[in-house]
Amino acid sequence: MEFMVSMEEASQVATADQSTDSSSKSTSRIGSEENEILERRTILDSANNQPLLYIFKKRKGFTIVSADLRVMPVLAYSDKSNIDPNHIPNGVTLWLEMAKEKIREAKRDTSPPHPIVLKEWQKFLSRQLRTSDSYCIEWYQYGQYQCKYTSTQKGPLLTSEWSQRHLSTTQLSSGGDCDDCGRRFAGCGPVAMAQLEEFYHPNLARPRFSNGTCFATNAGQVSLGTLMQVMGSKSKASYNYMGTCATFTWPANVKSGLKDFGFSNGGNGNEAYNFALIKSELNGNHPVIFWGSTCLDCFADYHIWLCDGYLQHHYSDFNCTTKQCNQWSYSYLNMNWGWGNDSNGYYAFGQYNPDEGDYNTNLHVITGIRP
């Protein structure tokens, strides 16, 4: 219980301004009206009913905050996207399961929080935390100047926030009124493919958002619906899959579908999660496709989506024993989930503290996509 973060304390984190610059030592970041919390939800550990993390919907954007001091405070955030804390969409649910397991791992370790992590919490919380790192003479002499925080960011690359419904389905046949417009869902695979095509070969007549209206009234809206229909055909999408509203697309068919559409490469064969490779792709202005499910035949939570950016906080903490800087990076990936403006934002991947393992379960990545 010593390291537990209360809902009230997590709210202090959520209402602070999220910034790419984490170097501030101030504990008084003032939340603006846009950071006002509208809804909140506690995600509990099913094993012991203890909090693992908190989800905050704000007047503008959202923040997901850890419930334990042994992992970094901000796990995910956006300053513009919407989130419904009580109805988490596919894709986000996969990340959420991964985040919960990382926090469980940190809680199993009885060690106190790492100094880098604790100092990050101290920037947000009103209570004083006991840091284990007492500064030595070398820190005062040169360590504080030698060990500097930096950050790197790329993206977001996409300008579209398309979904599976409304204008995305105007060229699809009716099928159970799945999209509130009397038509089938476009499918997560075709949405990802269509957004890739729009990124590489933009048609600015197409709307940036597909939600909000059922019928196309101009050439750009018609073009969007047609592109979705073509991508569904190229990827052999199965509409109303197994008698449901789901539209299912195999990842292999996404790759071959992009190639058939005219891309020079629909994606490489190795789909193992590799942050360095993802970062390299994004630095080259190439979004990557993520896909996954909680198990091999768990089709209900299966999803395909795009990653179009990253943000890394590079921490440097002086070690009084070794007289060296301890380096560690905390990494976010920017996700465009293919649900319109729902839940898009930066999500933490890799290590949640410097002592933790780096694993990402049930996630696959398609890299090497080229127009």
What do these predicted regions represent?
Residues 74-244:
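Active-site-adjacent structural segments surrounding the nucleophilic cysteine of cysteine proteases
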Residues 40-59, 264-329:
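Active-site-adjacent substructure of cysteine-protease-like catalytic cores
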Residues 1-47:
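Short, non-transmembrane alpha-helical segments in secretory-pathway proteins
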Residues 55-56, 64, 187-198, 226-233, ...:
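Structural recognition of the beta-strand scaffold that forms the well-ordered cores
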Residues 6, 57, 180, 184-189, ...:
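Extracytoplasmic/periplasmic, Sec-exported soluble proteins
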Residues 6, 10, 42-47, 51-53, ...:
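Noncatalytic regulatory segments and standalone regulatory/sensor domains
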Residues 209-218, 244, 260-276:
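Catalytic cysteine-centered active-site loop
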Residues 246-261, 357-370:
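Catalytic cores of secreted or luminal carbohydrate-active enzymes
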